[in-house]
Amino acid sequence: MASPASTNPAHDHFETFVQAQLCQDVLSSFQGLCRALGVESGGGLSQYHKIKAQLNYWSAKSLWAKLDKRASQPVYQQGQACTNTKCLVVGAGPCGLRAAVELALLGARVVLVEKRIKFSRHNVLHLWPFTIHDLRALGAKKFYGRFCTGTLDHISIRQLQLLLLKVALLLGVEIHWGVKFTGLQPPPRKGSGWRAQLQPNPPAQLASYEFDVLISAAGGKFVPEGFTIREMRGKLAIGITANFVNGRTVEETQVPEISGVARIYNQKFFQSLLKATGIDLENIVYYKDETHYFVMTAKKQCLLRLGVLRQDLSETDQLLGKANVVPEALQRFARAAADFATHGKLGKLEFAQDARGRPDVAAFDFTSMMRAESSARVQEKHGARLLLGLVGDCLVEPFWPLGTGVARGFLAAFDAAWMVKRWAEGAGPLEVLAERESLYQLLSQTSPENMHRNVAQYGLDPATRYPNLNLRAVTPNQVQDLYDMMDKEHAQRKSDEPDSRKTTTGSAGTEELLHWCQEQTAGFPGVHVTDFSSSWADGLALCALVHHLQPGLLEPSELQGMGALEATTWALRVAEHELGITPVLSAQAVMAGSDPLGLIAYLSHFHSAFKNTSHSSGLVSQPSGTPSAILFLGKLQRSLQRTRAKVDEETPSTEEPPVSEPSMSPNTPELSEHQEAGAEELCELCGKHLYILERFCVDGHFFHRSCFCCHTCEATLWPGGYGQHPGDGHFYCLQHLPQEDQKEADNNGSLESQELPTPGDSNMQPDPSSPPVTRVSPVPSPSQPARRLIRLSSLERLRLSSLNIIPDSGAEPPPKPPRSCSDLARESLKSSFVGWGVPVQAPQVPEAIEKGDDEEEEEEEEEEEEEPLPPLEPELEQTLLTLAKNPGAMTKYPTWRRTLMRRAKEEEMKRFCKAQAIQRRLNEIEATMRELEAEGTKLELALRKESSSPEQQKKLWLDQLLRLIQKKNSLVTEEAELMITVQELDLEEKQRQLDHELRGYMNREETMKTEADLQSENQVLRKLLEVVNQRDALIQFQEERRLREMPA
């Protein structure tokens, strides 16, 4: 909106300041504003009050109202909370600027130094709901009229820094550009203060500036001395960012954004991408802001194959170094991926220019993420104390697919400012540090779902943001090492005592393990456990252990006619299928007594899973939480294999016999070979030796974890996410698992005909073969009626397609009454706008609608985010149901449509972030496993070598090996937990796809449907029923496990 003609130069300076798009323009226009008003810049909060008092300008009033509202919060004490505090903030990134704004509102004197002279990055940042409200409250719409006007909530990092820079200048923050912070200069004598070492040639006033608080926001590559950084490493992960020119044409406006497509649950998209372009990705995101911004994770082999990387180098820095990346090939790669993801609707993709005037496309490594061990420290010298705090990337490097950088960065900025407030109030150093570390413990766990829902109440006080806050979670005693009194020599702390005085916890020693096994097998006929070799050779001790933990599977009398190999094989198989304990050695090795280390490792898994379980007479024992996840996935995997084996013929399900099948164990004659070879276990794929921590068991066969990968794409196979082809015997990920029968594949479409274990499976009864899957209702029932063709009304189908099972519900209540038409309308509308990353759904809101930035619209948007949708009036219900079938008609209701689209996209983003968090954690687990395997191999070799090492040393090595085994078991069970969540995401995706497909049939007139259409519609309906029942089984399993794990 053009401002009226004004003769006051201050008004012109203000308008130029608000609209400035370059750092230098912002600074020069602000200096002109201050000169025109006769105000000295950088004068703290008093400067803001002077500007506001003298600039009586209608265009500024809305901005003053917002800043006054924020400053009037009681926590700031009218700008008097930190009036005697001097702060230095290093770094003018979003987090550093946000921290500076909070410190200024507290009344502190704030000086900020930044080594750059301009903001040049185009990257687009995802925003959580509270960050949107927070930025609006600081006047974001005034400075950037297009702020969060699309269906996805994001902003370019350049625009975010510009608007925060303008707020910081108005609030009196003193900013110095082109100044690099290189370190601290301690006070030389008593009475002096802390200063900064700055380059090059800082102004004399800045060089002599003494401060008592330092906030570092200089990025992950610069962390002040004294802080310890921990590396969180995963598998090699190569990210590619690309920014294309946004011409803001009508065609570009109508291309939907992609909030995230992840291979972990949407494999068909990536399979199509690979076939069409040869590009192999893990995920891709597309945001539309100042540029068309794409970010994706590419596979190294694909980059090598397409010539983006010249050669395969082991060091990541060299692999992605300038000399090894072909710029032209990288540009072709990014352009082709972006063009495919948007169906070519963006037209000619022209790269935006980076700060050096080159095409803005880059490959980067996010294999490792750095995280500071502590968030704050205190240094004291000559009586002068300095409080140091970290915010932004130097505190926690964000994982880009999760969109947590700005959100958690802002939270850390608030927490750091709260720490400064407590410091200014006179709280002791240890108390301040303990509170700050208590908050830091919460940071990595925060998400929009586990914070306070009312984002309007968020403020500097942590209690307004974090529910169930405990500021004493970390005690002052625990942070003494963060208080550095440089004048004194510290006595050795308890934490610095030699390792020999530390006690080991969390794993059983061999004596404790042997005693536990003796207790579990006591009273079983013919069993007397005295060691970890000969006592287990006949298989009876292992059967006794399984019998004690799972009564009813096999009575002692039934073992009389069973041979040692048969009994041992039975015990190993039942322990895996019914208790979730995967073997680490073969039945022959147990019989030969040749691998006591392997047996100790195997039995320690029993101990960790059942040591706290009480066994009452007749009571079926249950494994503790995480082993039950392994058990669930094992049943799911076997169910998938059985389903594929019964493609050509249906066979009635029967209980699996207690004797082993020939294919599940090696032949008996191999026993002598094992006896001679000692502890030899060989990988069945590569034929190389398997050490204990390397062993990965599938159906009684052992592999290296690194060897157990998809035969087609060589991707790592995780529990519940692979299948074995009965023809060639190879293992495949579900994406590349060959179809045995093409007709069946056509019937199933994109769905794998998996049958989830029903909740009854978790009661540890014998593992029967699953009954034939009925297409109408796969959930077993006491009396299954004859199958019949289901014909539902349109409304019944609409209700079915809108089902959404909530995984975190309590115990199952009685069936709910049918939902109101209002609920159905909202669900229908929401489904009509969901794109789930495949941009073929409803077009975006026209740009003309997005651009509205008047105050009434802004307030309306804020209300929409803060409050739930109001109940619909009865007369609107039928209208909205009709609109759900005709999304084009929603142009008549832009507010509803914008709100529903935004909320649908928010749900999509949550789903994508969840999938990416799982993927990242799985990669970290795999990397940690490799480290444990390498360490365990060294210990195992030392233990197996005939040497003159003292027994005490061997016992120490054995205890260390057991601790590594315990760590591995914990990682395996965590991996299983994650894969259950993957199954949940996969079923949600299948339900969404089927819902969309069914809605397409429903939207057609009944009279226009052919017989083939009717057949296909019923087929989709049957599949939808299957998926809904599978989700129900999964949720019931999770609920039963949750109830089982609750304290009595």
Swiss-Prot record:
Amino-acid positions noted as binding Zn(2+) 2 in the UniProt annotation, renumbered to this chain: C710, C713, C733, H736
Residue ranges, compositional bias (Polar residues): 747-765
Listed Acidic residues bias regions: 852-868
EC code: 1.14.13.225, 1.6.3.1
Cofactor requirement: FAD
Tissue specificity remark: Expressed in the postnatal and adult hippocampus; found in dentate gyrus, the polymorphic layer, cornu ammonis (CA) 1-3 and in mossy fibers of the striatum lucidum. In adult hippocampus strongly expressed in CA3 pyramidial neurons.
Main location, first listed in the record: cytoplasm
Gene Ontology cellular-component annotations: actin filament; ciliary basal body; cytoplasm; cytosol; endosome membrane; hippocampal mossy fiber expansion; intercellular bridge; midbody
Catalytic activity, reaction form: L-methionyl-[F-actin] + NADPH + O2 + H(+) = L-methionyl-(R)-S-oxide-[F-actin] + NADP(+) + H2O; NADPH + O2 + H(+) = H2O2 + NADP(+)
Domain LIM zinc-binding: start-end pairs: 681-743
Residues with the Phosphothreonine modification: T475
Region (Monooxygenase domain): 1-489
Domain Calponin-homology (CH) residues, every copy: 507-611
Note on domains (UniProt): The C-terminal coiled coil part contains the plexin-interacting region. The bivalent Mical/EHBP Rab binding (bMERB) domain, mediates binding to predominantly Rab8, Rab10, Rab13 and Rab15 (in their GTP-bound forms).
Oligomeric and partner information: Associates with the SH3 domain of NEDD9. Interacts with VIM and PLXNA3. Interacts with RAB1B, RAB8A, RAB10, RAB13 and RAB15 (in their GTP-bound forms); binding to RAB1B is of low affinity compared to other Rab proteins; at least in case of RAB8A and RAB10 can bind 2 molecules of the Rab proteins simultaneously. Interacts with STK38 and STK38L. Interacts with GRAF1/ARHGAP26, GRAF2/ARHGAP10, RAB8A, RAB8B and RAB10; may bind simultaneously to GRAFs and Rabs and connects GRAFs to Rabs. Does not interact with RAB1 and RAB11A.
UniProt name for this protein: [F-actin]-monooxygenase MICAL1
